[in-house]
């Protein structure tokens, strides 16, 4: 891929990829590394994607890098809750209700959390989410519905 194309994609999507990677990894430092790896891969490899599908392709690459990173042997186990709490500062002006919704989302298992995040926070269609997570569209729909049902239980005081 040409340098100009990578710069254009970086300008258009780096912030969204960073937010996604922060959310996925739980660490802004890890997210920076993941986003850097995605764009370095674009510079180094002959990359082909369908026109108009750049964003989906980049998020698929980022999701794969995140999974690889979380699986790596050098990755420490456990989650530093204080670090996760600090990461929320990246998301602007959370009011109490938005904060409660986001906290409830963060408490969901990955299988429910990621489809909900990608659909409601990143604006992806079920079809695009299926491609990113490598599951069927019907599985995306089921996971979103089940995740929303689980969140509803935890958010009853706000309803």
Predicted regions span which residues?
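Acidic, proline/glycine-rich intrinsically disordered inter-domain spacer in sigma factors
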Residues: 77, 82-106
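Sigma70-family region 2
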Residues: 37-54, 73
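Conserved RNAP core-binding helix
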Residues: 10, 18, 28-44
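Residue-level preference for hydrophobic side chains embedded in well-ordered alpha helices
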Residues: 9, 13, 17, 38, ...
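A short pre-motif secondary-structure segment
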Residues: 115-119
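A short, charge-rich alpha-helical start-of-domain segment used by transcription regulators
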Residues: 1-19, 23, 113
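Arg/Lys-rich amphipathic alpha helix in sigma70-family domain 2
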Residues: 60-80, 146
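DNA-recognition helix of helix-turn-helix
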Residues: 133-157
């Amino acid at each position: 891929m040409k340098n100009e194309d990578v710069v254009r994609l970086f300008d258009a999507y780096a912030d969204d990829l960073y937010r996604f990677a922060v959310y996925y990894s739980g660490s802004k430092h890890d997210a920076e590394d993941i986003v850097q790896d995605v764009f370095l891969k674009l510079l180094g490899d002959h990359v082909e994607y369908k026109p108009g599908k750049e964003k989906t392709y980049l998020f698929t690459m980022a999701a794969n890098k995140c999974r690889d990173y979380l699986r790596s042997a050098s990755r420490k186990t456990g989650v530093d809750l204080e670090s996760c709490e600090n990461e929320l500062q990246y998301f602007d002006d959370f009011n109490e209700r938005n904060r409660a919704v986001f906290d409830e989302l963060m408490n969901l298992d990955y299988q429910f959390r990621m489809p909900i995040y990608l659909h409601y926070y990143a604006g992806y269609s079920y079809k695009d989410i299926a491609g990113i997570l490598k599951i069927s569209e019907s599985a995306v729909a089921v996971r979103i519905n089940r995740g929303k049902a689980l969140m509803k239980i935890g958010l009853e005081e706000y309803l």
